[in-house]
Each structure stands twice: as structure tokens, then as C-alpha cells.
Amino acid sequence: MFKFNEDEENLKCSFCGKDQDQVKKLVAGSGVYICNECIELCSEIVEEELAQNTSEAMTELPTPKEIMDHLNEYVIGQEKAKKSLAVAVYNHYKRIQQLGPKEDDVELQKSNIALIGPTGSGKTLLAQTLAKTLNVPFAIADATSLTEAGYVGDDVENILLRLIQAADFDIDKAEKGIIYVDEIDKIARKSENTSITRDVSGEGVQQALLKILEGTTASVPPQGGRKHPNQEMIQIDTTNILFILGGAFDGIEEVIKRRLGEKVIGFSSNEADKYDEQALLAQIRPEDLQAYGLIPEFIGRVPIVANLETLDVTALKNILTQPKNALVKQYTKMLELDDVDLEFTEEALSAISEKAIERKTGARGLRSIIEESLIDIMFDVPSNENVTKVVITAQTINEETEPELYDAEGNLINNSKTSA
């Protein structure tokens, strides 16, 4: 309430002591007065403290090397992809840190990231580990579930709802989060030629995603699903949300070969054939993604492309044993809680890795293979006090026989079963 009491003399601001005729307005409270100048000063102090809190949070941003070191603890191999991600993520959050009063006219634009690699090569794990490293909200979405507005399926805004939920509905936190959109290659146009048939999960979805990739204020239904005219919406600005797009892009090697073929005319076929799959992917360019079916505007919003290599037996064995949360360590700990030691022979680790390659599941399939070999043991061991040690051998994996079981004195107690 604004009030001047003209019956009283010498009304003063209770904070700065100025008389009412020295200021524009004097606001009366319960026995106190505050002038417009002190109100402005208080407002500035509050804004500075809020900005300082944001700045302090961002000063904890790790360097690219520190990000890379943390990724190395959980993700084996894929050095080039990890380095590209570390630099891109560092620059992204440094850009957010720079936001505020502009000292010059240079505006740093957001750079979203595309991860291209086969199933089980570590795309999702890289994105998850990045979010944990930076302690920001993280959400995963599957592009195959998205359709353009008006068709059965999810609206692209539902991706943002998952991030908001991950941030416990703290919009400020969500606006600095990371969203990983998997299977992005599945929304490529079915052909480079525009068809009269509606491609409801292709170009239309790319157009819808385009808006949130480049930065917009989106209206998100708090309960998910389709929007309704009278529904209350959550407003979220996507300008500072980092999008990581992942996809296998099966067959893109042929697209790259066709492009390279235009430049190797006159050479022998052997010269052109020397490009193996990894070497081809290393030479991927925006025009290859366009030929695959992504629209130019969409590609322009994802300027950073990192390639993930197909994992070989050695890499998969390292994944089984080396990361902080390696599967072998997890299952060893699980049986340790029942006072049972678990061991994997080198041959068993090789057999697990070879089976994952055979199934074309990459690192993603390692857990299911181990689970298959241990399910009976994990069922029986808690009620069998004689077993103190379990050894997984190559025979266990390849022939689906029972692991070797030992008692406290080191005696093999299921010899007849393992040789059956």
C-alpha cells in the first residue's frame, strides 16, 4: 500500500533515513516506512544473490579432461567419441555459464550431438554417464514412439515431460538438463523423394523435433499424452537443454561409399574396397545423413557427429571386468552377499564376448548371457551351505552346463554334473 500521511511531519525511510520529500514514494508498513530507492536496492541484491547461486553451480563445471576421465571409469573404448562428447558438453555448459549481461555482441549457439554406432556400442551409457558426471537431470526417449501431431503415438513434448519429471518438476533444473533420443535413424524419410503418402513417424517428427532442438518455449501437458484445449500446461524453455541423438544408421556405409565412389573414379576396385566399415563411418558428412533421410534443417541443428566403433572380443572382455560397475564385479558382489566367491575363467569371458557378437547385441547383451549361466546357481546357492565358490567356465557358456561348484575345502562337489 502506498501512503503519505500529510498530517505527520518528518516522515522518513526506516532504512536510509531520507525524508519523504527527498524520495519519489514512501511505502508505509506496520510502524515502518521504506522508500522507492531502498526497494530498488533490495531488488538488485536479491537478483545478484540468485545469479551468484547459479554462477556458483556452474563454476563446478569439470574440464573436458575431467569429463573424459570420469567417462573412462564407466565406458571402455570409444576414445574418439568420448573426447568429442567431453568437449561438446563442456562448451555447452560453458555457454550457459556465459549467459547474462553481454559484454559484447557475440552470441554462442547451442551444439547438439549425434552418436552413430551399432546396437550395444555404448551410446546410451555415454549419455547417462555424462549426466551423472555433471549432476544434471537426464531423460531417455525412443524416437520410434513419436508421431507428428494428430496421429496415434507420443507428441514430441512428452520427451520434455520425462526431463521435467527427472528434475522433480523443478523447471529451472530441467532447462539445463540432457535428453537422449535413441533410434533417431528410424525417423528418417523412407526416401529422398517427397511422397504423397503421409510419413507420420518420419519427416513430420523431424519437423516437430526441430523446434525443441533449436530452442523454443514449449507447452507440456503435465500428465503426458495429447494436448487438450482447456488443459493447464507446463512452460519450459528448451534453449539450454542439450540433446544427444543416437542411432545405428544401418546401411549408411553404402551411402558414404556412393559419395566416395564419385571421387575414386580411375582407381581399381580394390582401391575403393579398402574402406572398411569403421573407416567409412569416420568419413561421414552431413550430406550422407541427408541422403539417408534426415532433412537439412534437422541436420543443421546437430552439428557434432561422433562415431562409435563396433566392439570386438577384447573390448567386450574389458567391459566385463574393468569399469567401476563392471558386470563381473556386480555379480561377484551379489554372490558375496551369500558368502560365496564367484570366478570367471579367461576362456569364459571370451566365450561370453563371442556370444554377444554372434547375437549382434554388443555390450547390451552381456548381462543376459551371464544371467542365463547363473540363474540356477543364484536360485540354489542361498539354501546350499556347502557351496562356497562358483567358477564359470567356457563350457558353462558354450554348452550351457552348470558352473563348477566348490566347498570350503576346495573340493569340486558337482563333478558328475559338469561332465555330463
UniProtKB/Swiss-Prot annotation:
Matching HAMAP family: ClpX
Gene Ontology CC terms: HslUV protease complex
Identification of the protein by name: ATP-dependent Clp protease ATP-binding subunit ClpX
Protein purpose: ATP-dependent specificity component of the Clp protease. It directs the protease to specific substrates. Can perform chaperone functions in the absence of ClpP.
Single Gene Ontology BP annotation: proteolysis involved in protein catabolic process
Pfam families: AAA_2, ClpB_D2-small, zf-C4_ClpX
Species of origin: Staphylococcus aureus (strain NCTC 8325 / PS 47)
Matching CDD domains: RecA-like_ClpX
Domain of life of the organism encoding this protein: Bacteria
Record text on subunit structure and interactions: Component of the ClpX-ClpP complex. Forms a hexameric ring that, in the presence of ATP, binds to fourteen ClpP subunits assembled into a disk-like structure with a central cavity, resembling the structure of eukaryotic proteasomes.
InterPro entries assigned: AAA+_ATPase, ATP-dep_Clp_protease_ClpX, ATPase_AAA_core, Clp_ATPase_C, Clp_protease_ATP-bd_su_ClpX, ClpX_bact, P-loop_NTPase, Znf_CppX_C4
Binding site for ATP: P118, T119, G120, S121, G122, K123, T124, L125
Residue span, ClpX-type ZB domain: 1-54
